[in-house]
Amino acid sequence: MPEFDLVEGFPAAEDDLRTFPTTSWKGLIFTGLQPSGMEACLGEMESRVGWMPIEKFEYDNSRNRCYEIRANWALYVDNYLEGFHIPFVHNDLNRTLDYDDYRTEIFDGGVLQIGIARDGEPSFEIPEESPDFGLEVAAYYYWIYPGLMLNFY
């Protein structure tokens, strides 16, 4: 660089960007300032949805929805984690899911909600090795603390 030839001790290791531990799953890369427990969360997801070819999923812009809301992030998470509003807000989803069989499971570091399909509605073909084999699952909704949401439907 012009006029930089007289600078001493640059670059040095302390000039580098910080590095953070990373882990990957199905082509997704995860990191955090002080990550803990992500392996357990990924293990939970692997047992439930690991049979899906997630690493081959492709973005479909036609299915993208963007909503700008003025709310605290905790209120948004609370809304995501409760299914009570589904019959009143999400008409299409309510026609697909059996609200009486909507399930919420807590695991270390996150929450999984499982939407069971009504009779005749689309659902996953779940393999025998899955803990959900035999269920007509239409959707898996994962929330990983503090703010990662993964939806599979």
Question: Where are the regions that the model predicts?
Answer:
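C-terminal catalytic domain of Rieske-type non-heme iron oxygenases
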Residues: P21-S24, L28-Y153
